């Protein structure tokens, strides 16, 4: 089990309360698909992903990005039980979707970039450290079924 300090919890929940889930989720997923184009193979049903412009304008990318970040919000609400919070999603991504678990880490790193861009003044080194810890824990929880 992960130990969260009171300060880490406050930093994470404080910033999360300001996050526009639709915009940041869409941007994070779009960046993942652009920066790591091999991840596009998991989204073949999304239509045109042929260029950064197409990806950024794709409504299915936007909708799924919001869904992903909404799910990430479940981690913020359940910091002391992230493993169980993501048990079903881990099973889905492993057994049905066959997603490489490394992609969870990549998306977490992208989310850090997006949050830093949107909250530059508030995204202090302490804030980054807390969020980096959170995305690592979420990525590990999502990869749990693979082990």
Curated annotation (Swiss-Prot):
Residues 3-147 form the Globin domain. Heterotetramer of two alpha (or alpha-D) and two beta chains. Belongs to the globin family. This is Hemoglobin subunit beta. GO terms for cellular component: blood microparticle; haptoglobin-hemoglobin complex; hemoglobin complex. Involved in oxygen transport from the lung to the various peripheral tissues. The beta chain is a component of adult hemoglobin A and D. Keywords: Heme, Iron, Metal-binding, Oxygen transport, Transport. It comes from Aythya fuligula (Tufted duck). It comes from the Eukaryota. Red blood cells.
